[in-house]
Amino acid sequence: MVKLPSASRIRSLATVPSTATRAFATVNPTPPAAQPTKSKPRFEKLDDGLTFDDFLSGDVPPENERVVLGNTKQPRLPSFLKHPIPTGASYSGIKKELRGLGLHTVCEEAKCPNIGECWGGGKGNATATIMLMGDQCTRGCRFCSVKTSRAPPPLDVHEPENTAEAISRWGLGYIVLTSVDRDDLVDGGAAHIASTISKIKQKAPNILVEALTPDFATKGVNVIHTVASSGLDVFAHNVETVERCTPFVRDRRAGFSQSLKVLEEAKKGAKAAGREILTKSSIMLGVGEMEEEIHETLRRLRASDVDVVTFGQYMRPTKRHMKVDRYVEPEEFAKWKNVAEGMGFLYVASGPLVRSSYKAGEFFIENVLKKRRAAAAEHAASQLSTQPPEIAAKV
């Protein structure tokens, strides 16, 4: 039998105020309604900005009150640095031939802005800078877009022959070879570069060869002499920037003094082999250098007996690379050309789009080298003519 509560107990419970909320097992209690909050417009500045009617009326606010979109932390690319997209039969033909032989060019790997101009010329005028030893570099310079690897693939033993074959087909008068750094190789790839130059000279004896080389750091001077005495005409190695900026621009294994030593040893190695070569280096502007530092760099290059120097604008290849400090005006490039020529450099190329292997400079150097060859031949002929007839006949 269930015992019921007494009547007094029921009355006492009825008089106690209840704060409990009634809920059903199958229905969630409804929370108190929240006060609606006004969401902030995503493009508030644009909503408060100009309308189409404002532009029609001409009432445009001052520049400091306008909304600016995009990257404002880097200087805007000037019009004189903009270049057309490369096209044309010559461009397509060179690209197809390079692919067929499995060759790489620094023109493509380094995203050179002059590729359309250099590859777009007719036969005898088109130029391409062949990049030897693959497309993966053991260095990681902050300005360069060439791929980096600690362990690149082995060298292609057929590359020297394929390179010489391609160049002989083009019918060029001047060719530029460059390469990635290969710190993983015992000689840094010097023998591979020298072999390529020798094979080019065998297939096309009259062609002039320029080699833009690595610094061969820790490999010794003999590897520099190997390349310099291989039959090339121009030995190029770039200091890239002033000494103070070198640690921030180039790979930590590269050094300004080491680069000067490479250029000096190249002249010594060629002379020891009975050859006469030109040496060449390049400087990028717009990476944070100061005027006096450029003067000092030029003085040290001349002290190292460098014959040719080029100036060009640093252009950021991707957002992963270091930013441009400033865009140098064409007038300043013209100034540095005059300064360098006054210091005794044989040839100076200076301009926003000039690169170390720029064809305008190649044509000038080609003429200089041909004149030197002609002068040497004339001197030899004059020496021969002064000999007695019987000795001259033996010679």
UniProtKB/Swiss-Prot annotation:
GO molecular function, one term: metal ion binding
Residues the entry annotates as binding [4Fe-4S] cluster 1: C107, C112, C118, S357
Catalyzed reaction equations: [[Fe-S] cluster scaffold protein carrying a second [4Fe-4S](2+) cluster] + N(6)-octanoyl-L-lysyl-[protein] + 2 oxidized [2Fe-2S]-[ferredoxin] + 2 S-adenosyl-L-methionine + 4 H(+) = [[Fe-S] cluster scaffold protein] + N(6)-[(R)-dihydrolipoyl]-L-lysyl-[protein] + 4 Fe(3+) + 2 hydrogen sulfide + 2 5'-deoxyadenosine + 2 L-methionine + 2 reduced [2Fe-2S]-[ferredoxin]
NCBIfam families: lipA (TIGR00510), PRK05481.1 (NF004019), PRK12928.1 (NF009544)
Transit peptide limits: 1-24
Pfam families reported for this sequence: LIAS_N, Radical_SAM
Protein name per the record: Lipoyl synthase, mitochondrial
